[in-house]
């Protein structure tokens, strides 16, 4: 067990709660102490839902441990069924309750209810939230389809042609607390409808148990989020013969590949590559336009969940012309795919759930843009580097009221804006910092609003805080001291590489035995490392 200030994923019962909250007619009875009820805030505060998650907690206390906690569990199950009348019941336990070993799932199944009861065994001390969500969805689908006839050898994805109807597919994987899932579903539905493909079921988001039961009526499955739906898609393919897509439609290139893949699975004529000319997404042309030329070659560090990291690395490298200098994920289930992607870029993938290790990797790689989670946003802010959030965990500001997908053509437009705008703002800040001594930025001079006059002050405008980096007093005594002249020269260097320049200059000064770093030492160090 590890004590940490921040964590990328919660325990697996949070993942189960995400599935239950995403669906209709499903209730989750969670055997947990009172302290584990904090999870409600994730949905009401972060996701901003209008109702509480459909979860009943047993909320046992220390004094209950001396009695029969099994009866406490059965009492709460009985109350939940009588009050909420669910169509399907999930029963599980939190990390704390796992130690008691009451086996609430077995207790629920022995109570004689006619509704489907899904017992969840989620190892809290070895697995995390995304795995818990995937396992819950998998067990729910298996449990509800256990009486459906298996038809692996008989299924034909092209049977829609002989039945005189349009092909239909399932969209699997979107859930609450996923990154822009709600808007992604709408965008993918719009694209598929444009190509004559109907949606059979979207699950778990917005689905009811009755929808899950008819999930095998589709011709194929679309796995939108492998962290949540891949295990379910594999099971459906093995038992019902339903093929599923492997390409995630995030970015222009991936969306084209996705359309080709789903057309091939369904036996449809491949679509024309009309999207390449920018008629569907503006990302392609914008990334080639004159105003965006300065973006080419910018160093970018990417970290987040596996799905969005893999998509972001492809977009950054192939569609925007960025140089990927760091790639990693906290999703151990996706570690192999991320390692393979990093290897293609000549990098070693960072697989960790320690946000401090990620921050250290950002420092070492000295990127000009960070694409990460809410935690990387904080780290990048401390380091003075522009950042865009591409993955959960996220802040409430990353759940916008507007339509803001990541997938499809409109998703590519959103991604371009979200990634490029921080770079533009960063460039503006750097230019203001470089020219802050010019007369336009001096308070004593008249502004462009001549009739209003300037500010009368004898003090020079104070530079932004990130230009006033000083050597920390806690540094060892052998570290060289920066003179005011050296600090002034350092401030002229772009903020996104200033940390690396400072470190290299101090290293050079130590090598030559220099105790004070002035402007000349800085230039000598630059020449030394560029030689």
Swiss-Prot record:
Could you name the active-site residues?
A: 291
List GO molecular-function terms, semicolon-separated.
Answer: 4 iron, 4 sulfur cluster binding; ATP binding; metal ion binding; oxidoreductase activity, acting on iron-sulfur proteins as donors; oxidoreductase activity, acting on the CH-CH group of donors, iron-sulfur protein as acceptor
Q: Which residues form a coiled coil?
A: none
**Broad EC category:** oxidoreductase
Q: In which pathway does it act?
A: Porphyrin-containing compound metabolism; chlorophyll biosynthesis (light-independent)
- The reply to whether Transcription figures as a keyword in the UniProt entry is no
How does it associate, per the subunit comment? Protochlorophyllide reductase is composed of three subunits; ChlL, ChlN and ChlB. Forms a heterotetramer of two ChlB and two ChlN subunits.
Q: Which PANTHER family match?
A: LIGHT-INDEPENDENT PROTOCHLOROPHYLLIDE REDUCTASE SUBUNIT B
Which protein, by its recorded name, is this?
Light-independent protochlorophyllide reductase subunit B
Its gene is chlB
């Amino acid at each position: 067990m590890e004590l940490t200030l921040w964590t990328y994923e919660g325990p697996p019962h949070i993942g189960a709660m995400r599935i239950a909250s995403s669906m209709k007619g499903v209730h989750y009875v969670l055997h947990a102490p009172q302290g584990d009820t904090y999870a409600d805030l994730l949905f009401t505060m972060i996701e901003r839902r209008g109702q509480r998650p459909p979860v009943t907690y047993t909320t046992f206390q220390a004094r209950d441990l001396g009695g029969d906690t099994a009866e406490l569990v059965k009492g709460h199950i009985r109350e939940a069924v009588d009050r909420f009348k669910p169509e399907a019941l999930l029963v599980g336990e939190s990390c704390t309750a796992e130690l008691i070993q009451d086996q609430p799932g077995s207790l629920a199944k022995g109570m004689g209810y006619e509704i489907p009861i899904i017992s969840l065994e989620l190892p809290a001390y070895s697995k995390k939230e995304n795995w818990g969500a995937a396992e819950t969805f998998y067990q729910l689908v298996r449990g509800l389809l256990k009486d459906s006839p298996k038809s692996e050898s008989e299924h034909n994805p092209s049977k829609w042609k002989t039945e005189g109807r349009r092909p239909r597919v399932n969209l699997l994987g979107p859930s609450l607390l996923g990154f822009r899932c709600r808007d992604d579903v709408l965008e993918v539905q719009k694209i598929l409808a444009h190509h004559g493909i109907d949606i059979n079921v979207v699950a778990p988001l917005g689905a009811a148990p009755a929808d899950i039961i008819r999930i095998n009526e589709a011709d194929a499955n679309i796995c939108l989020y492998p962290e949540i739906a891949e295990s379910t898609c594999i099971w459906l393919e093995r038992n019902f013969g339903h093929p599923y897509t492997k390409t995630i439609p995030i970015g222009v290139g991936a969306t084209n590949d996705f359309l080709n893949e789903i057309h091939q699975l369904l036996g449809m004529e491949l679509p024309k590559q009309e999207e390449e000319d920018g008629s569907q997404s503006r990302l392609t042309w914008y990334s080639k336009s004159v105003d965006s030329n300065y973006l080419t070659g910018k160093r970018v560090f990417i970290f987040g969940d596996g799905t969005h990291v893999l998509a972001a690395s492809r977009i950054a490298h192939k569609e925007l012309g960025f140089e990927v200098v760091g790639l990693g994920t906290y999703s151990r289930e996706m570690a192999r795919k991320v390692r393979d992607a990093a290897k293609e870029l000549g990098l070693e993938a960072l697989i960790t759930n320690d946000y401090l290790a990620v921050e250290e990797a950002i420092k070492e790689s000295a990127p000009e843009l960070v694409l990460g989670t809410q935690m990387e946003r904080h780290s990048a802010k401390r380091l003075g580097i522009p950042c865009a959030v591409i993955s959960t965990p996220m802040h409430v500001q990353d759940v916008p009221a507007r339509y803001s997908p990541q997938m499809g053509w409109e998703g590519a437009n959103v991604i371009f804006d979200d990634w490029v705008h921080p770079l533009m703002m960063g460039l503006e800040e750097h230019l203001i910092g470089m020219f802050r001594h010019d007369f336009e930025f001096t308070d004593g001079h008249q502004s462009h609003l001549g009739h209003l006059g300037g500010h009368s002050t004898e003090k020079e405008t104070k530079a932004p805080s990130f230009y006033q980096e000083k050597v920390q007093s806690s540094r060892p005594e052998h570290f060289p001291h920066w003179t005011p002249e050296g600090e002034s020269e350092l401030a002229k260097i772009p903020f996104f590489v200033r940390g690396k320049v400072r470190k290299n200059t101090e290293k050079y000064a130590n090598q030559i035995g220099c105790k004070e770093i002035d402007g000349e030492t800085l230039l000598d160090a630059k020449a030394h490392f560029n030689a």
